[in-house]
Each structure stands twice: as C-alpha cells, then as structure tokens.
C-alpha cells in the first residue's frame, strides 16, 4: 500500500469489535454522524473473499481498491487507514472504527445530505481532526507525546 500510495507515510489496521461485524455487512459507511462525515467520499470498500491477506498480490489489490482514499473497509475483515503520518493514520482508524460502531447501533439512521456531509468534512479537516484524535488518545493513555513520535 505504501509503495502504491507515495503520499501516505503510515497505514493502520486492526481487528476491532465494531469493525469486523460492520465489514461483514458489505457496505460503505454513510454520513450518519459528525465523525462519519470525515470519510464521506474518502473511503472505499474492498469486496474480496481473501480475508487472510497472505500475498503481495492481495496487498496490491487492496492498494488498488483504496485508490486515493484515506480509508478502506475490508470485506469480512476490518478496516485500514492511511495518513501523512502515524497520527493521521491511527487517529483516522480509531475514528472510522467508532463510525462503524455507530452504524451497527443506529440501524435506521438517516444520512446527512451530501452538502452537509461535505461542509462538516471540510471543517473537520481544517481542524486536523484525525491528528487531534490521535494526540487525545496519547495524552490520555501515555501522557508523554514524545514517547510515541
């Protein structure tokens, strides 16, 4: 992925409780929460049955499906995010996992309009929300930002 996406310095993936069941539903995230708007028109869905990625070829298929997006939902597997650095990739991953949980809990949620989702996304990007989420976690769990950078 990092070879294909030269703008990405870091990638984050992990199998979490909210991500795996959501990924098994085989659908993209929708802008149903403020956090979800950050991924509006900026994530992909990898519809492949090779859930145990064991080859360079499978990794390349994921990279191709990811395209220029910052995140991808991997069918029946979980999530993957990329970023300009560790804070963006990890912060984005945690936020996307929360978005997946919201989708599982709010089954009848009505998505925001594309215009509202784009506006929220632009504002959150201006605030560097993924980076902020990462440093909030570091401050809470580690305390020393220099220990993780």
Regions found by a protein language model. Name each.
Residues 21, 34, 38, 42, ...:
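Alpha-helical context
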Residues 70-149:
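A conserved C-terminal secondary-structure "cap"
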Residues 3, 27, 64-67, 95-98:
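Short, intrinsically disordered, mixed-charge
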Residues 40-94:
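A contiguous pocket-lining binding segment that forms or flanks enzyme active sites
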């Amino acid at each position: 992925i990092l070879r294909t996406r030269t703008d990405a310095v870091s990638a984050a993936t992990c199998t979490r409780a909210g991500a795996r069941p959501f990924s098994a539903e085989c659908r993209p995230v929708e802008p149903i929460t403020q956090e979800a708007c950050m991924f509006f028109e900026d994530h992909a869905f990898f519809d492949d049955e090779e859930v145990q990625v064991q080859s360079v070829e499978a990794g390349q298929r994921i990279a191709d499906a990811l395209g220029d997006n910052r995140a991808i939902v991997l069918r029946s597997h979980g999530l993957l995010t990329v970023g300009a650095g560790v804070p963006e990739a990890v912060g984005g991953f945690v936020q996307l996992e929360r978005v997946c949980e919201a989708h599982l809990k709010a089954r009848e949620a009505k998505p925001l309009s594309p215009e509202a989702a784009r506006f929220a996304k632009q504002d959150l990007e201006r605030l560097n929300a993924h980076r902020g989420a990462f440093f909030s976690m570091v401050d809470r769990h580690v305390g020393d930002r220099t220990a993780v950078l």
